[in-house]
Amino acid sequence: MRIFTRLLYAAPSNMGSAASLSEALALLPPIPLYRRILRVHRKKLDPEMRILGDSYVKSEFRAHRGTENPLHIIGFLTEWQLYAQKLEGDSWIGEKLDQGKLDKMSDQQLGQLYELMQTIQNKDGKGEGEGESEK
């Protein structure tokens, strides 16, 4: 990601939902943010979910490495920084996805989200029988 210094420290007042950005926050550069997310995974997630989360974060940061559009960069960094803050504060447990964000997703993104949900459910043992066998 090629990022200008002025973009790194811009307050993303128009990105994300108003509730999640009640205070203006300075964006972390990509590498420190990446390290912060991996550190939070190490502290907050169980080993199986940490492996899944780490591999997902690595693939997303690799996929967006060549992004040059400033709006995409700010949006990407903002969402990952909010994710890290939620994990650090334990406010993510039991939280549902915002309908506005779901509406903005492309078909490919919705497919990826569905695959992620299936993977998580299979890790928990819920997805194997699709809820038919309860013990």
From Swiss-Prot:
GO BP of this protein: gluconeogenesis; mitochondrial respiratory chain complex II assembly; succinate metabolic process
Keyword Transit peptide among UniProt keywords: yes
Compartments it resides in: Mitochondrion matrix
Signal peptide residue numbers: none
Cystine connections: none
Any single Gene Ontology cellular-component annotation: mitochondrial matrix
Transit peptide feature range: 1-12
One Pfam family this sequence matches: Complex1_LYR_2
Keywords: Chaperone, Gluconeogenesis, Mitochondrion, Transit peptide
InterPro entries the UniProt entry points to: SDHAF3/Sdh7
Record text on subunit structure and interactions: Interacts with the iron-sulfur protein subunit within the SDH catalytic dimer.
Function: Plays an essential role in the assembly of succinate dehydrogenase (SDH), an enzyme complex (also referred to as respiratory complex II) that is a component of both the tricarboxylic acid (TCA) cycle and the mitochondrial electron transport chain, and which couples the oxidation of succinate to fumarate with the reduction of ubiquinone (coenzyme Q) to ubiquinol. Promotes maturation of the iron-sulfur protein subunit of the SDH catalytic dimer, protecting it from the deleterious effects of oxidants. May act together with SDHAF1.
Family, per entry: Belongs to the complex I LYR family. SDHAF3 subfamily.
UniProt name for this protein: Succinate dehydrogenase assembly factor 3, mitochondrial
